[in-house]
Amino acid sequence: MNTRVLTGITTTGTPHLGNYAGAIRPAIQASTQPGVDAFFFLADYHALIKCDDPARVARSRLELAATWLAAGLDPERVTFYRQSDIPEITELCWLLTCVTPKGLMNRAHAYKASVDQNAAKGVEPDDGVTMGLFSYPVLMAADILLFNANQVPVGRDQVQHLEMARDIAQRFNHLYGREFFVLPEVVIAEEVATLPGLDGRKMSKSYNNTIPLFEGGAAGLRNATQRIVTDSRLPGEPKDAEASHLYMLYRAFSTQQESMAFRRQLEEGMGWGDAKQALYERLERDLAPMRERYVELISNPGLIEDILQAGAAKARKLAQPLVRTLRDAVGLGALQPAAAKAAQPARKAAKDARFVSFRDEDGSFRFRLLAADGEELLCSVPFANPKEAGALMRRLQDEAPEQALRGHDDVSYAAWLDGKEVAYGPQAADAGARDALLAKAREALAQLAAA
């Protein structure tokens, strides 16, 4: 069975050389591997959270689609579609919203960062916070779960959202008594190439130090390479290749043999002007054919639209049967005669508490104890590997709940093993609320022990 890998493409801004080397090129290369069903989508609904300029959103969709196609994405081999062309995504988003606890969304990093910024400014915590920003992780979960993606490659800043998608999928599966959703695996992109910008810092639009991918043509590329900051060593003086931004850029686009030859030239005293020209020529050799294709595509948006519509049709063939199944599961299926409905076996209500494990954004492993209604009752300390976390989950089930779970202070409680706190309960409003949560957590552990 093939592995489904899903990649979302944010449709804000114009791609630069760093985007290509760090995300576009490796994703396209990965899509050609045997045994992989690759899904790529333009996340234009997500773009509306960050941008309220319709012209910019529309232009960015065109540029991003043209860029990925020009860079070698094969729409015949992969499923390439636009998020807004798949109505099943928004329908699933609502079904998932109805089972997602608000407390889970309260912990999302983007939301918490906005609240912290507002606190620093002395304004209301939710000032300027839209429901789009607040519920963004649910839409992301719908993007992933609709196609039952097995793997989702992300940077560390997105790990939490993937873990939330797993949590939401588990809650839905548990509530409606079937494994409707595959739990997606977080694939952290550890080897993502980070290119230096014109000033040596990470290439980023935020630093205004980017090298254009296609924008400005060959002249724009040449102009950018000429503006790369170098040290003051003169022609004839040996250069330190490892400390050179020029060398790092050259190495990212050259073969090992080419890279070694360029390094030798720098160490033998090649002037910075000649080095910049060599970098430009090496980049242009790769980018010129892609740029030509990009210009053709940008000038023919109808062709891109046809490709995206074909991709949407392909995607919806997979999405529609699942959504029909989910509609039936939640009671939104077609009306049936009373006799037919009576003949159907009643779905067994899901009443069990459960542990769920997840990987934190720093790479450590944790687990949560959830009540039957999905409320979080415990969150563990971090562990170096999943076996440690799993062993402690099993031990907690074997311990007497009254001994394992004890009050931490007036408004919180913790799980104790071997004299150490290994997990913490949520902070309550007062001692009475804490006692109620503690009793609920003990009941959940007892239920797990009896299962």
UniProtKB/Swiss-Prot annotation:
Main location: cytoplasm
Keywords, sorted A to Z: Aminoacyl-tRNA synthetase, ATP-binding, Cytoplasm, Ligase, Nucleotide-binding, Protein biosynthesis
Location(s), subcellular: Cytoplasm
Pfam families reported in the protein's UniProt record: tRNA-synt_1b
Residue window of motif 'HIGH' region: 11-19
InterPro entries on file: aa-tRNA-synth_Ic, Rossmann-like_a/b/a_fold, Trp-tRNA-ligase, Trp-tRNA-ligase_bac-type, Trp-tRNA_synthetase, YegP-like_sf
EC annotation from Swiss-Prot or TrEMBL: 6.1.1.2
UniProt short sequence motif 'KMSKS' region, positions renumbered to this chain: 202-206
Binding of ATP, residues: T10, T11, T12, G18, N19, G155, R156, D157, L195, K202, M203, S204, K205, S206
GO function term, MF aspect, one: tryptophan-tRNA ligase activity
Catalyzed reaction equations: tRNA(Trp) + L-tryptophan + ATP = L-tryptophyl-tRNA(Trp) + AMP + diphosphate + H(+)
Superkingdom as given in the UniProt entry: Bacteria
Record: residues binding L-tryptophan: D143
Subunit structure, as described in the record: Homodimer.
Function field: Catalyzes the attachment of tryptophan to tRNA(Trp).
Family in the record: Belongs to the class-I aminoacyl-tRNA synthetase family.
Protein's name in the database: Tryptophan--tRNA ligase
Organism: Bordetella parapertussis (strain 12822 / ATCC BAA-587 / NCTC 13253)
Gene label: trpS
